[in-house]
Amino acid sequence: EIEENAELDLFESFNAHAGDERISAVVADMEAELGKGNKMAGILPRLAQYELTLLDWAEAHKGSRKYVVFANKCWPAFQTQFGFVPCYVNSRLTKIGIPVACEVDIYGAVSEYIGVCVSQKPVTLLDINNTVPADIYNDDIAGKFPYTHKDTFMGFHCGNTASCLVKEPQMKFQRIMKRNLEPDSEPNISRGTLEGDIVDGNITFFRFQSTADAQLKGYIAEGEVLPVATRSFGSIGIFAINEMGRFYRHVLVQKNYPHHGAVAFGHYGKALHSVMTYLGITDIGFNQPKGMLYPTENPFAD
């Protein structure tokens, strides 16, 4: 069941939580979670107010349903009106089994929820369309890991990944929004990201998606996060998936998938494939090994 509400409705509810007596307890919990990474303590009360807003909203609106996910708008008007970026709160709710997808990504939220059910662990939602700089690949990956440059990519989002999945998590600000919205001042309304390199280890990148004619499709690709520093910002990691370049071209791009992918931390391809099959999905893309051509792949290409 989907309930659609305006950002204005959320803003009204947020304002109604001003002065909520529970805010101090949530701030204390945030402080304990962040530890030495609590670099912008002044924004925590507003973030706590927003977290309570979402939790109360879920309880008040779930009706007979047992589980809830959110697909929320998070920019550009959000910062100027709410006074922060919501990434850290999104990460905290996802950590406790209430996925909050960025940028109103409904199928991203559904994908995250299924990932939680399959893995029984927190998941995340990342952009899948950023390359690894050549110098990082040449210096830290080539000859050390069994991947070509095209097998690797940067999985990135502003700061929405749970603290348990990030190395040395720190409360920071969204740099792009800072440049656009408050270029000449100290970070204020751009504060609220949870930043750090994502923990290395096995992962499964996947997504459930609908087509314009209401047909479900999906993709699954197992891989890993490499133990290589990203030298960047946000919740970010260097991912490696065998034959990623071909998979990106012939599945993600050719089949019009959005740039968000859900990430489960472990290899769960078998279970996710079964879930997709149970849901009647027949178009299930995966990273086909070298020599196993995609239907439109040129057999004469290098």
Would you name each region that the model predicts?
Residues 1-129:
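Conserved, well-structured core segments that form the ligand-binding/active-site neighborhood
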